[in-house]
Amino acid sequence: MNKIRVRYAPSPTGFLHIGNARTALFNYLFAKHHQGDFILRIEDTDLLRNVADGEASQLKNLRWLGIDWKEGPDINGPFGPYRQSERLTIYQKYAFELLEKNLAYRDFEKDKKNFAIRFKVPPNQTFTFCDLIRGKLTFLSKEIEDWVIIKSNGYPSYNFAASIDDHLMQISHIFRGEEHITNTPKQIMIYQSFNWSIPKFAHMTLILNQERKKLSKRDVNVCQFIQDYADLGYLPQSLFNFLSLLGFSPSSCKEILTPQEIISLFDVNRLNKSPAIFDKTKLDFFNNHYLRKTPIDDIVSFIKTKLDFFEVLPINNQKWLTKFILLFQERINYIKQLKDLYHHFFDKNTSLSEEVEQFLKKHDCALSVLTLFYHKLNLVVFEKEAINPIIAEIAQNMKINKKNLFVILRIGATHKMQGPSLALFLELLGKKQVLNNLSKIVELLKNQ
């Protein structure tokens, strides 16, 4: 097999979309599996759609995901430049060759001055290629009109520029979305016109939401861009793992895989023909798995980069913040959920729910239990190492169902029936707040 060279060629029109990230990742995995080259090329010839910082955001998001490239706009290589806007003379050269061969013609506008160059679609011809995922695909030339290769502004069309670049950059395989299938016969026309070898194509399936509809901005539960997930506190390794399984069924019996394991397992023969389903629940499961293994200091660093969002947290109290993260680390699916958990569990103005009041009414022992709990907590240094023995002592001495007892203690100290590890939670709430909570419940029970 000749040297494997693949490319990801985004347009700088905004942030890195989920679908494009999957395309980049599959190209990257294929190259790495075969010890080949992964190339980044910027297709910036659609001037009206290009946005400021579009290229920079693409590069930033790819690197965040863990995808690097051997050649690209920021890494010199032997086949540059790697921005199409810097290759205009190359496209014009090949367009004029086609004019000279009578395989293209000038299509003048009404002013008779400006013109586009159109490719002459050969009559009565069949274009067939073997897609690595879908098998044999055939197109008839009679179904394709003469198409523009150079626009009147001198810029190339997508299909023309991509074909020229893929040949000159020695691209051997092209992995892309199925929406590009209809572009393939036009690109084959260019290869055949110059007697160039045709790269192998693999058109990946669409990514659908759980209603089996194409992802759209109306999907409120699914963020569309990689940057959104980074901002929420999803980890790059979880996105890498999750995206790699959207349309790929590895031979491994497990789903949690390291990048190196995925590279080793990646096999074009195991790419799916049916659409991939974006399962947000599975992504959250993956991210929770990786968050559990993430050093606390890394989560603290993330929080400190989002001060405007986490302003409610006592950011400057490193000891408290570390314990707070430890308390909830195994419960969160992404880091920004910590803010919601803080509001839910540390809001000092919460009122008792009807469920809590009904529970207390059913347990006559609650008053004596919570009175004892108050007095014992009032005597100790407020750390979990001192609080845990008190809870254990009360549980041992009170002849009450243990499950109900712990709920009574939690309600008294936190005003909630459920929550994280009680002793550490109380330490973080602080002695003043916990004793105040207990006092309110004790008074309520006395007055019933």
UniProtKB/Swiss-Prot annotation:
Is Nucleotide-binding tagged as a keyword?
yes
Residue numbers binding ATP: K217
Keyword Calcium found: no
Task: Please list every transmembrane segment annotated in the UniProt record, as residue ranges.
Answer: none
Reactions catalysed: tRNA(Glu) + L-glutamate + ATP = L-glutamyl-tRNA(Glu) + AMP + diphosphate
EC number(s) per entry: 6.1.1.17
Query: GO CC: one term?
Result: cytosol
Motif 'HIGH' region: list the residue ranges: 10-20
Where in or outside the cell?
A: Cytoplasm
State the Gene Ontology terms under molecular function: ATP binding; glutamate-tRNA ligase activity; tRNA binding; zinc ion binding
Q: Where is this motif: 'KMSKS' region?
A: 214-218
Please explain the role this protein plays, according to its UniProt record: Catalyzes the attachment of glutamate to tRNA(Glu) in a two-step reaction: glutamate is first activated by ATP to form Glu-AMP and then transferred to the acceptor end of tRNA(Glu).
Which PANTHER family does this entry report, sorted A to Z?
GLUTAMATE--TRNA LIGASE, GLUTAMATE--TRNA LIGASE, MITOCHONDRIAL-RELATED
Q: Which family does it belong to?
A: Belongs to the class-I aminoacyl-tRNA synthetase family. Glutamate--tRNA ligase type 1 subfamily.
Which protein is depicted? Glutamate--tRNA ligase
Question: Which source organism?
Answer: Phytoplasma australiense
